């Protein structure tokens, strides 16, 4: 075992610490259920630090058996909408035909009535300007 989760508070603080790192731009699949997290706290820090939270398509694939992934990602979308915080979609492609496959995400987008302008995948210029500046090494 390479990682052992902690409490919801410990897990959330660990992710927040990563988000405050100037070299971290995106937190990948926080909603997949691997760790219990406080999504509202993460969304607030996402807005503050310009660290994007990824909505991960593959974590919701039936073959993954991650039953909390869809409700967690729906909650993330609802919070992003509430706080007007951009997100990024990830296909997490495990095969070439799965690249840019958002088929598990789109029903959640519709259910949340999530605004397209908060999806940075569709706006490369906005994506690049949204990223926080990376310090020189």
Regions found by a protein language model. Give the residues of each.
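C-terminal domain-boundary segment and adjacent tail
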Residues: 94-96, 113-127
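Extended substrate/RNA-proximal surfaces in nucleic-acid metabolism proteins
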Residues: 1-55, 59, 110-113, 118-119, ...
């Amino acid at each position: 075992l390479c990682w052992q989760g902690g409490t919801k508070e410990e897990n959330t603080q660990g992710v927040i610490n990563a988000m405050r790192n100037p070299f971290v731009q995106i937190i990948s699949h926080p909603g997949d259920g691997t760790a219990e997290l406080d999504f509202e706290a993460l969304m607030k820090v996402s807005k503050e630090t310009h660290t994007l939270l990824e909505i991960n398509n593959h974590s919701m694939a039936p073959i993954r058996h991650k039953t909390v992934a869809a409700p967690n990602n729906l909650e993330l979308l609802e919070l992003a909408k509430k706080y007007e915080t951009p997100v990024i979609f990830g296909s997490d492609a495990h095969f070439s035909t799965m690249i840019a496959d958002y088929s598990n995400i789109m029903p959640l987008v519709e259910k949340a009535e999530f605004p397209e302008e908060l999806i940075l995948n569709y706006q490369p210029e906005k994506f690049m300007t949204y990223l926080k500046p990376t310090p020189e090494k």
